């Protein structure tokens, strides 16, 4: 279910303040965050945000197409290595 329009999009305050400080100083550096739930705002465009996936921080470069999505969408938490192969074929 989508978030109510009257509530507006959510972004963690600490993340927004870090991005605003970088924008004022015209700096582009990697910002580490654990906030996968934050919505990507237009102010984030051009920055690289390292999003935590439960194991490590995955660097995500923010482009225009990502605005409105959540940060967690771009840092997958599960690694899929494929199903086990069928050994019957290799035995012959």
From Swiss-Prot:
InterPro entries: Ribosomal_uS19, Ribosomal_uS19_bac-type, Ribosomal_uS19_CS, Ribosomal_uS19_SF
PROSITE patterns reported in the protein's UniProt record: RIBOSOMAL_S19
UniProt-listed Pfam families: Ribosomal_S19 (PF00203)
Record's keyword annotation contains Iron-sulfur: no
Disulfide bonds: none
A GO CC annotation given for this chain: small ribosomal subunit
GO MF assignments: rRNA binding; structural constituent of ribosome
Keywords assigned by UniProt, alphabetized: Ribonucleoprotein, Ribosomal protein, RNA-binding, rRNA-binding
Biological process, per Gene Ontology: ribosomal small subunit assembly; translation
NCBIfam families: rpsS_bact
Family to which this protein belongs: Belongs to the universal ribosomal protein uS19 family.
Function in brief: Protein S19 forms a complex with S13 that binds strongly to the 16S ribosomal RNA.
Protein name per its UniProtKB record: Small ribosomal subunit protein uS19
Organism name: Bacillus licheniformis (strain ATCC 14580 / DSM 13 / JCM 2505 / CCUG 7422 / NBRC 12200 / NCIMB 9375 / NCTC 10341 / NRRL NRS-1264 / Gibson 46)
Gene name for this UniProt entry: rpsS
